[in-house]
């Protein structure tokens, strides 16, 4: 069966990952000891996408947990579902990366990476037909960004034909945890552009906004934010785990969403998001789901899709609904907002329908969009990067770990190229496409 191997790294990655497993266990009826306690055969039918069945009927997540310090791992282990993970799959160092990308990528992380790869290999060998990897990490710190990208590039070498999906938490515009975030993020994007197949871009500020505005939470915690992320993560793979009328998998997703290989950074959204008090006053309909799903306030990263154009998008619906209605709604969105879609990719929205809704909801939908407006985020990080790099501020922390300034310059120009590519396709029209083809050929030559 099409298994997915889940990897989480660093503090942020481990906290998101822990929440994700709570959601997945809940959907498949697995209790915190790993025993099945559900009531529907459908929960077990394709449970092996994310779980390995061990002796005594226990289900063990196909998860690898890594960090350069033991703290977060301990809290995952003592958390509600901490006991279902395989103890050997916790790989951690003692020193920490101290928010330093170079430590995670070159020094501390490099020492630990082989033991992580051993665990990954062992898990991959347990798979019948491994479909790919999903990695949770943040790009602002040291471990998730530095060691996370190191692991991604190593896995790329060893499993070149498997899908590599990342859930990457970008530094947010107004909320900054560390001063050197722009450095860490730029160096990471440099890696992700080359080595990942699909990146779901998340950021804390957008998630906070959703919690404040839509969910009406007075004081959102990281737990609330991570819950939003895990709902989306579960939606991305629901087609693999439950039967549906229109299925999609990681590869179909990539084929439908990525028109040019470098442009694989997606915005994600989830619907229905309603505040706890007002849930019972809303009837869920496909039009309503669609409307909320495309709403810019619903996007989990701080870029406004109205400032750019969608190259492609994908909508995954869950629950009992008519596919005809889904198709009509999707067409409707495209016709009414045609200026926000590039016209040189006709029918650029893919939809899929899965019959089983998430627990507690009649129907739900997950949105993944490849929009040129995501350049706003890269541009913002790039400006912060340039401001510090021009003065060579904080560089000694990185050069001290053996990095070269050259690497910073390369990462910076790669990020700026990415922004320029998004801009180019945002401005492109169907008529002047021929010119681009000539340019592409020249570039290729």
Curated annotation (Swiss-Prot):
Primary location group: cytoplasm
Subcellular location: Cytoplasm, Cytoskeleton
Residues that hold GTP according to the record: 11, 69, 138, 142-144, 204, 226
Gene Ontology molecular-function annotations: GTP binding; GTPase activity; metal ion binding; structural constituent of cytoskeleton
Highest taxon of the lineage: Eukaryota
Cofactor(s) needed for function: Mg(2+)
Binding site for Mg(2+): 69
Family matches, as CDD domains: beta_tubulin (cd02187)
A single Gene Ontology CC term: microtubule
Gene3D superfamilies named in the record: Helix hairpin bin, Tubulin/FtsZ, C-terminal domain, Tubulin/FtsZ, GTPase domain
InterPro entries: Beta-tubulin_BS, Beta_tubulin, Tub_FtsZ_C, Tubulin, Tubulin/FtsZ-like_C, Tubulin/FtsZ_2-layer-sand-dom, Tubulin/FtsZ_GTPase_sf, Tubulin_C
UniProt-listed Pfam families: Tubulin (PF00091), Tubulin_C (PF03953)
Cross-referenced SMART domains: Tubulin (SM00864), Tubulin_C (SM00865)
Keywords: Cytoplasm, Cytoskeleton, GTP-binding, Magnesium, Metal-binding, Microtubule, Nucleotide-binding
Keyword Nucleotide-binding: yes
Region feature Disordered, mapped onto this chain: 426-445
PANTHER family registered for this protein in UniProt: TUBULIN (PTHR11588)
Subunit organization: Dimer of alpha and beta chains. A typical microtubule is a hollow water-filled tube with an outer diameter of 25 nm and an inner diameter of 15 nM. Alpha-beta heterodimers associate head-to-tail to form protofilaments running lengthwise along the microtubule wall with the beta-tubulin subunit facing the microtubule plus end conferring a structural polarity. Microtubules usually have 13 protofilaments but different protofilament numbers can be found in some organisms and specialized cells.
Family: Belongs to the tubulin family.
Protein name: Tubulin beta-1 chain
Provenance organism: Eleusine indica (Goosegrass)
């Amino acid at each position: 069966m099409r298994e997915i191997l889940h990897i989480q790294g660093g503090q942020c990655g481990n906290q998101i990952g822990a929440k994700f497993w709570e959601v997945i266990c809940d959907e498949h009826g697995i209790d915190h000891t790993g025993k099945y306690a559900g009531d529907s055969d459908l929960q077990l039918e394709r449970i092996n996408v994310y779980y390995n069945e061990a002796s005594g009927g226990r289900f063990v997540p196909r998860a690898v947990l890594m960090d350069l310090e033991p703290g977060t791992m301990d809290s995952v282990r003592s958390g509600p579902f901490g006991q279902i993970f395989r103890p050997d799959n916790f790989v951690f160092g003692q020193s920490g990366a101290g928010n330093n990308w170079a430590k995670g990528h070159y020094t501390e992380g490099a020492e630990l990476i082989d033991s992580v790869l051993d665990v990954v290999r062992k898990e991959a060998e347990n798979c019948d037909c491994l479909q790919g990897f999903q990695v949770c990490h943040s790009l602002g710190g040291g471990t998730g960004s530095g060691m996370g990208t190191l692991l991604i590039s190593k896995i790329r070498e060893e499993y070149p034909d498997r899908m590599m999906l990342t859930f990457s938490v970008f530094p947010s515009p107004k909320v900054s945890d560390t001063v050197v975030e722009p450095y860490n993020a730029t160096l990471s994007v440099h890696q992700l552009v080359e080595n990942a197949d699909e990146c779901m871009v998340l950021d804390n500020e957008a998630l906070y906004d959703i919690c404040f505005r839509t969910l009406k939470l007075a004081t959102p915690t990281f737990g609330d934010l991570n819950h939003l992320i895990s709902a989306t993560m579960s939606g991305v793979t629901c087609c693999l785990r439950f039967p549906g009328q229109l299925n999609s998998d990681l590869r179909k997703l990539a084929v439908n969403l990525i028109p040019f290989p470098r442009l694989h950074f997606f915005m994600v959204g989830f619907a229905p998001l309603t505040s706890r008090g007002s849930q019972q006053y809303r009837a869920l309909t496909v039009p309503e789901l669609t409307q909320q799903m495309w709403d810019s306030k619903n996007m989990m990263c701080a870029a406004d899709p109205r400032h750019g154009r969608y190259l492609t998008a994908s909508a995954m619906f869950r629950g009992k609904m008519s596919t005809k209605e889904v198709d009509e709604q999707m067409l409707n969105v495209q016709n009414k907002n045609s200026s926000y879609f590039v016209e040189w990719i006709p029918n650029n929205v893919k939809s899929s329908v899965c019959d089983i809704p998430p627990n507690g909801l009649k129907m739900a939908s997950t949105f993944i969009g490849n929009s040129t407006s995501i350049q706003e985020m890269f541009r913002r990080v790039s400006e912060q990067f340039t401001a510090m790099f021009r003065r060579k501020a904080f560089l000694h922390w990185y050069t001290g770990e053996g990095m070269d300034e050259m690497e910073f310059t390369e990462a910076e120009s790669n990020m700026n190229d990415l922004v320029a590519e998004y801009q180019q396709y945002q401005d492109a029209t169907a008529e002047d496409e021929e010119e681009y083809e000539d340019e592409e050929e020249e570039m290729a030559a």
